[in-house]
């Protein structure tokens, strides 16, 4: 993944500092830029892209931390972003509208009636093919990739192709 992007700086925060240090050590050869372990999540939110990989039930990514030109990816089925961030974002982009409305980052604001399907700007596919433009340099964008089977298959296909090109992997029989 890091080879696809020119990462100049990667900021990492974990409730458990030892876990953040281990991540830094594990990723040092994969990331060309500096990996900075932060002592609080606010410091880790500085950058073009903010990604939450967590099992947190606490809404720790604050509205006031995210500036125009940043995109936030709350990954998985958790609620990392405070409601104000979701409601004040310039655009919300999702991989699958139906799934994102019922679990993960958007669940609470949808359940409270504060966000509706028509508030979703686009799907990732709409943006990727140019049907729905974005101004990533000037907007606060929330992208909620809750996960779909189609996305898993597409990514698996890319990984498989690259593994073949590099002579990696092997075959086995399913029982």
Predicted segments with their positions:
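An anion/phosphate-binding loop that grips the pyrophosphate of nucleotide cofactors and donors
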Residues: 47-48, 89
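Rossmann-fold NAD(P) dinucleotide-binding segment
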Residues: 49, 55-75, 83-84
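NAD(P)-binding Rossmann-fold cofactor-contacting core
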Residues: 3-27
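Adenosine-phosphate binding glycine-rich loop
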Residues: 85-175
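A short helix->loop->beta-strand "cap" motif at the edges of active sites that frequently abuts
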Residues: 7-8, 67-70, 89-90
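Short acidic low-complexity segments
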Residues: 31-47
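Short glycine-rich anion-binding loops that position phosphate/pyrophosphate groups of nucleotides
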Residues: 55-58, 77-78, 98-99, 148
């Amino acid at each position: 993944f890091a080879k696809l992007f020119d990462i100049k700086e990667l900021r990492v925060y974990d409730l458990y500092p030892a876990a953040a240090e281990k991540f830094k050590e594990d990723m040092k050869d994969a990331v060309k830029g500096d990996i900075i372990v932060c002592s609080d999540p606010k410091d880790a939110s500085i950058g073009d892209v903010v990604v939450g990989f967590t099992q947190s039930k606490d809404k720790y990514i604050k509205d006031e931390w995210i500036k125009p030109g940043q995109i936030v990816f709350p990954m998985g089925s958790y609620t990392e972003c405070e409601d104000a961030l979701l409601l004040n974002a310039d655009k919300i982009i999702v991989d699958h509208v139906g799934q994102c409305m019922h679990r993960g980052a958007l669940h609470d604001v949808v359940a409270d009636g504060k966000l509706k399907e028509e508030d979703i700007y686009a799907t990732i596919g709409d943006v990727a093919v140019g049907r729905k433009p974005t101004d990533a340099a000037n907007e606060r964008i929330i992208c909620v990739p809750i996960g779909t089977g189609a996305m898993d298959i597409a990514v698996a296909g890319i990984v498989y192709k690259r593994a073949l090109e590099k002579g990696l992997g092997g075959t086995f029989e399913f029982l």
